[in-house]
Structures are given as structure tokens and as C-alpha cells.
Swiss-Prot record:
Keywords on record: Aspartyl protease, Disulfide bond, Glycoprotein, Hydrolase, Protease, Secreted, Signal, Virulence, Zymogen
Annotated source species: Arthroderma benhamiae (strain ATCC MYA-4681 / CBS 112371) (Trichophyton mentagrophytes)
Pfam families according to UniProt: Asp
Enzyme class: hydrolase
Signal peptide (from-to): 1-20
Taxon lineage: Eukaryota, Fungi, Dikarya, Ascomycota, Pezizomycotina
InterPro entries for the chain: Aspartic_peptidase_A1, Aspartic_peptidase_AS, Aspergillopepsin-like_cat_dom, PEPTIDASE_A1, Peptidase_aspartic_dom_sf
Domain Peptidase A1: 82-400
EC number: 3.4.23.18
Protein's name according to its UniProt entry: Aspartic protease PEP1
Length: 403
């Protein structure tokens, strides 16, 4: 997740971190996600509000009210959250891997006990180096927040270790984070310009270990309703079918930005649209710029596209009380297809059913708003439908169907 103050920031990134180099330039590793039982399920408007605020967009009052007025509910025994185990210092933590932020921050022994209870904690030791005068502070879209100081310590995933990685130790977290027992922090995988450490930003784990890797890339194979995986330094061809379609990345803001030329809803010869003037069937005009973000749960697109999609869903409505588009849980949902450099990336309709709220279900596709200049967000609802390559050479991003 990206904090509000990151919008438009292009920072000078510190390049002084040292890296352990076993078999330099040959490393590759797989990072499977693990399933962690969820202790509480928040109203989906919380995820929606966080996504909007994350990228500096205005949060409609109905969305804000639904998010702030919601309370966690007890999940069923089958509800799980998928995280990645990372060794930070001497201990293993469950972290979210987030391509939309540049910070590695964790719960620690510095976090007050009433906020850290139930979490795995990072424990600085005599081998950890505190960066005197350095700090970090993040506020997210649902007004959750965290902040603290910074250490240099070893961080390991698979067979790769950064021996002097910036680890942001939480000295305070808001209730939203304290109550989320499934995760112990976040590992950012954006470009390092988004790192928030002051007075000098630090490099991400990926950038720190980049020269160790066989190839300067990572891939993700996120799954719908089950754990996925990340691979660093190589492409596992057994995880995708067909050729990988690449498109250029715009990283001027630090994100993995790319362009989609058109979309279609359902099937049929009359279902293709450009993103400009979406109300006109078959027109071809301006393309759409968006951000690929594993740290955003939903897919957020312009009002006209979202309205057209739900116009094909019987009983769907933009519900002010629920803070977004909802529909009967047994409604038939059409597929949604994005055209990216000639490749058709299909999001199955069932992925658009994000979460039940009372007697209806909250949509995985929501509006990014109608004002110009706001980015479109291709979050997990989209990414779980694809095998994705995040390649720093270019830079570029690649898509293929999952095997």
C-alpha cells in the first residue's frame, strides 16, 4: 500500500546498502504464499476507501461512511488470508508483498504490547544497526497508520539474503493494523523512489538483491481462493500457458504503470470498446493508463466502464449505504477482458464477486471516479487472473494465462 504523501513524489534513493552475494548473479528462488486463518473480516468498503486514498483520489462520502461505520465480523472456518513468510533479523514474519509501495515495515519489540499482541515480532539485536535520526510514517486511505524508526539488518527470502536491508520498525500502529493478526507487516516491491524513510529514502529488498539474481525480474502467480506464489530471478514456464505478452512500464511515479488499449464485457462481436467514450459501442479512441498493484484488493476503473459492466448484471446497483456497487450473490457475472499490447487478459466473472455484505455481494470492480488525471488501478481482482512478469529491464511488464 502507498501512503497519501507519495503521490507524484520522485525521490533520490540511497544507494549505500550492502548486499550479501552468494553465487552473485545466479540466484533464483520461489516464495509460496501461506494461508493464515482470518480473525476478522472488515466491510469491503474499507478496502475500497484504502485503494482510493492510496493513490490520492477523493473518497466519496458514502464510501467513507461505510468504511468508518463498519466493524469486523467473525469469518467462517474457510476464510483465509494469503501472506508470505520472510526472515527478518532472527525471526520469521508473515508479510504482504506489495508492488504499490517501497517500504519494508514490520511489527517489532518496539511496538507497544497492546498493539502487537498476536503478531510475530521483529527483534533488533546487537547485530542490528539503528539509523540514528531516521524515521518513517505512513497513513493509509482508511486512516490506518504506522510509524517508527529504522534499522539495517539481514532479510532473507529463499536462498537470497540482503545483509544490510532497511527494516522499518513500528513504534506505533493504529487499531486497524493491530487487529489484523494475519500479517506482521509489509514488503514493498515498487521502484525504490517510493520509499518513505526520512531524511534519506532506502532501497527496496528487490532492488537491494537485484545483482544477486539470475535475471532482474520477479513473477507472481496469485490465485483466486487459494495461495499463490512469487518467483524471483527467473520465469517458471510451467506456471503459464502460451507466450508472455510484454508492454512497456511507465515508472516515472515509482509504480508499475502500463497501458491497456481497450476492454470488452462478456462475449460477442459487438462487445469491444475503447476506454475513451465507453458509452459508444465499438468506438476506438484513447487508451487507458493504469497501475499494476498487488497491494490493492480491488480493480478500480472509470465510472462509465464500471456502470456499463454492472448494467449487464441483474439487480446490481450503486448502494450508498454499502459504499459501492453491489448485486445479488447469485447473480450471473460476465467476464471482463482487457486488451494489452494485443493480448486479451480475461478476468472471469466469478472474480468480480469480492465479498458478501448482508444479503448482497460487493463487487470486485469499483469506480475510480470521473475526474481526469486519476490512475486506474489493476489490483488483485485482475492480477489473480494472470501470470505476471515484473521486469526491471525496459522496464516492462508481461502477462500470460495461468497454466
Amino acid at each position: 500500500m502507498v501512503q497519501i504523501s507519495q503521490i507524484g513524489a520522485v525521490l533520490a534513493v540511497c544507494s549505500t546498502l550492502t548486499v550479501a552475494a552468494p553465487t552473485k548473479g545466479k540466484a533464483r528462488f520461489n516464495v509460496p504464499q501461506v494461508a493464515v486463518p482470518m480473525k476478522a473480516v472488515h466491510h469491503p468498503a474499507v478496502a475500497y476507501a484504502r485503494a482510493l486514498h492510496k493513490f490520492g483520489m477523493k473518497v466519496p462520502k458514502a464510501v467513507s461512511d461505510a468504511a468508518r461505520g463498519s466493524v469486523p465480523t467473525t469469518p467462517t472456518k474457510d476464510d483465509e488470508q494469503y501472506v508470505t513468510q520472510v526472515t527478518v533479523g532472527q525471526g520469521k514474519l508473515n508479510l504482504d508483498l506489495d508492488t504499490g509501495s517501497g517500504d519494508l515495515w514490520v511489527f517489532s519489540t518496539e511496538t507497544p504490547k497492546d498493539q502487537s499482541q498476536g503478531h510475530n515480532l521483529y527483534m533488533p539485536t546487537s547485530k542490528s544497526k539503528r539509523l540514528d535520526g531516521y524515521s518513517w510514517e505512513i497513513t493509509y486511505g482508511d486512516m490506518s497508520s504506522a510509524g517508527g524508526d529504522v534499522f539495517l539488518d539481514t532479510v532473507s527470502i529463499g536462498n537470497v539474503t540482503a545483509s544490510s536491508q532497511a527494516v522499518e520498525s513500528a513504534k506505533k500502529v493504529s487499531d486497524q493494523f493491530a487487529k489484523d493478526k494475519a500479517t506482521d507487516g509489509l514488503m514493498g516491491l515498487s521502484f525504490s523512489v517510493l520509499n518513505t524513510v526520512q531524511p534519506k529514502p532506502q532501497t527496496t529488498f528487490f532492488d537491494t538483491v537485484l545483482k544477486q539474481l539470475e535475471k532482474p525480474l520477479f513473477t507472481c502467480t496469485l490465485k483466486h481462493g487459494q495461495p499463490g506464489s512469487y518467483d524471483f530471478g527467473y520465469i517458471d514456464d510451467s506456471k503459464h500457458s502460451g507466450e508472455i505478452a510484454y508492454t512497456n512500464v511507465d515508472n516515472s511515479q515509482g509504480w508499475w504503470g502500463f497501458t491497456a488499449e481497450s476492454y470488452s464485457i462478456g462475449g460477442g462481436s459487438n462487445s469491444t470498446h475503447s476506454f475513451h467514450g465507453a458509452q459508444h459501442r465499438g468506438t476506438r479512441g484513447s487508451s487507458i493508463d493504469g497501475i499494476a498493484d498487488t497491494g490493492t484488493t480491488l480493480m478500480l476503473l472509470s465510472d462509465d466502464v464500471v456502470q456499463e459492466y454492472y448494467g449487464k448484471v441483474q439487480g446490481a446497483k450503486n448502494d450508498q449505504q454499502q459504499g459501492g456497487w453491489v448485486f445479488p450473490c447469485d447473480a450471473k457475472l460476465p467476464d471482463f477482458t482487457l486488451s494489452i499490447s494485443g493480448y486479451n487478459a480475461v478476468v472471469p466473472g466469478k472474480f468480480m464477486n469480492y465479498q458478501a455484505v448482508g444479503s448482497v455481494c460487493f463487487g470486485g470492480l469499483q469506480s475510480v471516479g470521473s475526474s481526469g488525471g486519476v490512475p486506474n488501478i489493476f489490483g488483485d481482482v485482475f492480477l489473480k487472473s494472470q501470470f505476471v512478469v515484473w521486469d526491471t529491464e525496459g522496464p516492462r511488464i508481461g502477462f500470460a494465462p495461468q497454466a
